Amino acid sequence: MDYIADGDFAKKTSQGIVLVDFYATWCMPCLRMEKQVEEFASSNSNVSVYKYDVDRGVQTWNEVKKKHNVRSIPFVVIYKDGEPVAAEVGYKSSEELQKILDNIS
């Protein structure tokens, strides 16, 4: 699974279906969800999946929240051709992620 940052965010989310997992290394639900996101990615080769570490870039948490409409973490957003089409807060299993994807397809 690849990482995404603001420098390449628009490019990587501009085509097709893309799931972005906003997380932090200190967030226990985020760490528990990592395996679920990996399982989802392995069973959905048509979806690009990226992780966005909210502490990794130069922006503050408040800037990340504002720019990407992140309400809390873990936070998952599905983009279709550059536009957000689904967003979910909290721990999600791979099955729940699949249901979210199925609802937008």
Q: What name fits each language-model region?
A:
Residues 1-11:
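N-terminal "domain-start" segment that seeds a small globular fold
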Residues 42, 46-105:
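Thioredoxin-like thiol-disulfide oxidoreductase module
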Residues 13-25:
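Short active-site neighborhood of thiol/selenol oxidoreductases, capturing the structured segment around
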Residues 29-43:
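Typically the conserved alpha-helix immediately C-terminal to a functionally engaged Cys/Sec
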Residues 27-30, 76:
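The canonical Cys-X-X-Cys-His
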Residues 9, 22-23, 79:
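Conserved hydrophobic/aromatic "anchor" residues
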Residues 24-27, 82:
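Receiver (REC) domain active-site loop signature in two-component systems and cognate sites
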